[in-house]
Regions:
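Tight coil/turn sites that cap or link beta-strands
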Residues: 39-41, 76-77, 85, 95
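Basic/polar N-terminal segments that are highly enriched at the extreme N-terminus
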Residues: 1-6, 190-192
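A short glycine-rich, His/Asp/Glu-containing loop-to-beta-strand
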Residues: 10-46, 52
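Ligand-binding loop in jelly-roll beta-barrel domains
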Residues: 84-113
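Alpha-helical membrane-targeting segments
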Residues: 110, 118-192
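Short acidic-glycine-tyrosine-enriched beta hairpin
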Residues: 9, 55, 68-87
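Glycine- and acidic-residue-biased ligand/ion/polar-headgroup-sensing regions
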Residues: 51-63
Length: 192
């Protein structure tokens, strides 16, 4: 299920994402979005995508991008390419909202991942940085490990944490809860 031409708005981080082309629309080849980063947004955790390449074009405002240990400001008209496996983060330190065209190749399940995080934030299940509690974070990092990985958590440690939390995941039926986030999001259900 895709939600192209629909928007998701994260009430915690202020980020708004409009899905333009989804995995469904492109046979999995591409996910294209427009993302609004509000002014004075916080830097998210440094992360990487093991199998995906990202392209960003700043349409309005400016975007601060950290690649490795270097942070650089990109202004309107700038383009950014991030190869698979490159550790990065991006946010808006500017004085106005930033609007960015964002393409992800291949799409994989990025749409579901972003929708799940937004729904968790909008239902009060994250901290003020938009990060869910440790058990949910571990479950999602394992579920989406081909799409998104945090730079500070090695896969071996994540796998061990997943094993330790597994009884909790089963007791709370995380597999079912986090299986179809788009369906729950579109139905307006807040039960993630």
């Amino acid at each position: 299920m895709s939600i192209n031409n629909k928007e998701i708005a994260n009430r915690v981080t202020g980020q708004v994402i409009k899905f333009i082309q989804t995995a469904n629309d492109t046979n999995g080849e591409l996910l294209e979005m427009e993302s609004l980063y509000p002014l004075f947004s916080k830097e998210p955790p440094v992360h990487y995508h093991p199998h995906q390449e990202e392209y960003f074009k700043v349409l309005k405002g400016e975007l601060t991008v950290r690649i490795g240990n270097e942070a650089r400001v990109y202004r309107s008209g700038s383009t950014i390419q991030i190869k698979p496996g490159v550790k990065h983060s991006m946010w808006n330190e500017g004085l106005m909202d930033a609007l960015v065209n964002w393409k992800v190749y291949p799409a994989m399940d990025t749409e579901h991942f972003l929708t799940t995080l937004t729904q968790l934030a909008n239902t009060g299940k994250t901290n003020d940085a938009g990060v869910p509690p440790l058990p949910i974070l571990v479950f999602l990092l394992k579920k989406y490990n081909q799409t998104f990985r945090l730079a500070k958590i090695p896969m071996g440690i994540l796998s061990l944490m997943f094993i330790l939390f597994n009884p909790l995941f089963k007791a709370h039926d995380y597999k079912k809860k986090f299986n179809q986030p788009l369906r729950y999001f579109l139905a307006g259900k807040n039960n993630l």
